[in-house]
């Protein structure tokens, strides 16, 4: 059995660790709730934006709208955006996203380009031999609309070249506080069938006039949509990451509680043994006439 001092030191270390894990649990809970609010607000914006885009698509025939973002049949490779966290201690959150990304990348044989958002995922991808051509950090800790706009401009710029014909985003979709799952979503090109389940707004019979042209108007909507979509991805990923970290820290705190209980019992036993040994030594000394 360890000495009383050794057990005390071990117990103190575990108690300090518990304070840290519990603080991280509380912080992750707060950040998760904040991210969930942003997800809800941004979802309303995206729904309105998609409804407007559907209004345009529903009132134009295929040959009336020759937009470069709609059902483009050009050849080329694909762009994959992989969204993970900047920090660890969040269970299997990052590894699940990277695993899905690797699976999707293996389906392409024409050298797709990878863009990483998140330090953890960037390192995991490089460890697996996938080197991102662009990397952004800070999206998980401080997701902003400005960063979403920067990423959107880069993605649209790549898509409009002759080298790429598809853009995919791999991230963790937030369903609820109990359910989050890694998902790969095609962002570009936009297909008419993508808007079948979107509820239209306004007068469905009214004639729309587009100035300066329908393509210019739709172009602007696409830029706003891609920016809004990436911001939504940031928020869903942030909520999912903080739930994963919250669960990991809660589990760590519970394990610390169990260890503290075990060490406290061990400390009491060590103290009793120490007292017993001291009494035995005193008794032996009395019998031998040492006292």
Sequence positions of predicted segments:
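C-terminal beta-strand-loop-alpha-helix "lid" module of Rossmann-like NAD(P)-dependent dehydrogenases
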Residues: 1-291
């Amino acid at each position: 059995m360890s000495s009383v001092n050794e057990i005390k030191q071990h117990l103190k270390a575990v108690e300090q660790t518990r304070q840290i894990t519990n603080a991280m649990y509380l912080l992750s809970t707060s950040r998760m709730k904040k991210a969930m609010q942003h997800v809800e607000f941004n979802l309303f914006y995206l729904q309105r934006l998609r409804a407007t885009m559907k209004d345009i698509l529903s009132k134009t025939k295929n040959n009336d709208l020759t937009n470069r973002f709609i059902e483009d049949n050009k050849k080329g490779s694909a762009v994959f955006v992989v969204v993970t966290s900047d920090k660890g201690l969040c269970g299997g959150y990052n590894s699940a996203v990277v695993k899905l990304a690797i699976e999707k990348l293996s389906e392409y044989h024409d050298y797709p380009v990878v863009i990483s958002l998140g330090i953890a995922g960037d390192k995991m991808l490089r460890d697996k031999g996938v080197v991102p051509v662009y990397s952004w950090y800070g999206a998980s800790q401080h997701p902003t609309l400005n960063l979403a706009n920067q990423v959107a401009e880069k993605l649209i710029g790549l898509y409009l070249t002759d080298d790429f014909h598809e853009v995919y985003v791999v991230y963790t979709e937030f369903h609820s506080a109990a359910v989050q799952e890694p998902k790969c979503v095609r962002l570009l090109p936009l297909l008419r069938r993508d808007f079948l389940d979107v509820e239209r707004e306004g007068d469905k019979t009214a004639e729309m006039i587009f100035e300066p042209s329908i393509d210019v108007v739709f172009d602007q909507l696409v830029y706003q949509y891609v920016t809004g979509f990436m911001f939504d991805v940031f928020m869903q990923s942030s909520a999912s990451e903080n739930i994963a970290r919250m669960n990991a820290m809660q589990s760590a705190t519970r394990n610390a509680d169990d260890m503290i209980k075990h060490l406290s019992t061990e400390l009491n036993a060590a103290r009793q043994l120490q007292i017993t040994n001291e009494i035995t030594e005193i008794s032996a000394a009395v019998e031998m006439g040492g006292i």
